[in-house]
Amino acid sequence: MNQVELLSPAGNLKKLKIALNYGADAVYGGVSHFSLRNRAGKEFTLETFKEGIDYAHALNKKVYATINGFPFNSQLKLLEEHIDKMAELEPDAFIIAAPGVVKLALKIAPHIPIHLSTQANVLNLLDAQVFYDLGVKRIVCARELSLNDAIEIKKALPNLELEIFVHGSMCFAFSGRCLISALQKGRVPNRGSCANDCRFDYEYYVKNPDNGVMMRLVEEEGVGTHIFNAKDLNLSGHIAEILSSNAISALKIEGRTKSSYYAAQTTRIYRLAVDDFYHNTLKPSFYASELNTLKNRGFTDGYLMRRPFERLDTQNHQTAISEGDFQVNGEITEDGRFFACKFTTTTNTAYEIIAPKNAAITPIVNEIGKIYTFEKRSYLVLYKILLENNTELETIHSGNVNLVRLPAPLPAFSFLRTQVRV
């Protein structure tokens, strides 16, 4: 049995390193607005993206470059130049949505495999066959595809790799084909600048056809409703069914623009879930509790296991997003000697340490604080908050950009967190 690949988002170089250190087999990201994430695209330059590719390859891991926007005629020359520049960086694949761009990429860089973006909305064998014949090596399935349909496609096209999303935000529209943001904000989703208008609260109005009078329908709270707001996808409880099907080559986590902790925690938990499957030690309740430490819109298992008409629980009408069960207080620097404060942090408080896969944490006690283990979890308690410039504090807030000294080095890219909700 070939082990499934775990693919994590890389919104910038730091998140790329975090995802790989927390157990991702590969990451995906891009440069410029052609990558369908304007903000994330701006956080990578050609130079830092190349640095990320080299970093991944040194770990025997992969980087897939996103070129999955839908270009207009006026952009085609720039697109051609962009593909050529990206090919020089030697990514392990291009993720592309438009068939014309697929053909262009194969012409410019025939040695780089093509992964078809979920934006292409492949839902059936006929479409899969067309793209396979075009030269696509892997299809990132539409979120609306069922597992049974994926199995049928794999049986018919055994050399075609299938990738599915297992976690992250879901669009209200059909796999991202949405114009709400373009109409209301002039920001076009399929060119990478979605304003997430589906997350806003809206008010209902009715119109009298006789006189044109508009009347607002007042909800019980009187504050509108999140009528378009889709819950977040979470398939951590279905890893056994997915991997037992032998149809899926890669599990993908959404979230290039989300936090560093999100990149770490989702990768950490899905890495654990995949490894547990192969060792027959699955712990779905643990995965669920850990994923609830993240900000989310409520979770749904989407449409992979059940069809859309069979369920009415994929939306959250109450709120655009909810805080997670844990608060991130600090991010450990890459050299492991300091942490950056992300939330109010005080002395004599125990902060749980979340560390990369297989990282070693050594207990220690000294004048700055102690690092210890309790019930298979590691914690940090600070006796004093000593900044990098040797200023001593009893409390530090997130607005303070000075790094804080640790009692002893911790694994690079670790996090400090506290529970805020049981």
UniProtKB/Swiss-Prot annotation:
Enzyme Commission code: 3.4.-.-
Signal sequence range: 1-58
Enzyme class at the top of the EC tree: hydrolase
Disulfide bond annotation, renumbered to this chain: none
GO molecular function, one term: peptidase activity
GO BP, sorted A to Z: proteolysis; tRNA processing
Entry keywords, A to Z: Hydrolase, Protease, Signal, tRNA processing
Xref: InterPro entries: Peptidase_U32, RNA/ubiquinone_mod_enzymes
Family according to the record: Belongs to the peptidase U32 family.
Chain's role: Involved in prephenate-dependent formation of 5-hydroxyuridine (ho5U) modification at position 34 in tRNAs, the first step in 5-carboxymethoxyuridine (cmo5U) biosynthesis.
Protein name: tRNA hydroxylation protein P
Name of the encoding gene: trhP
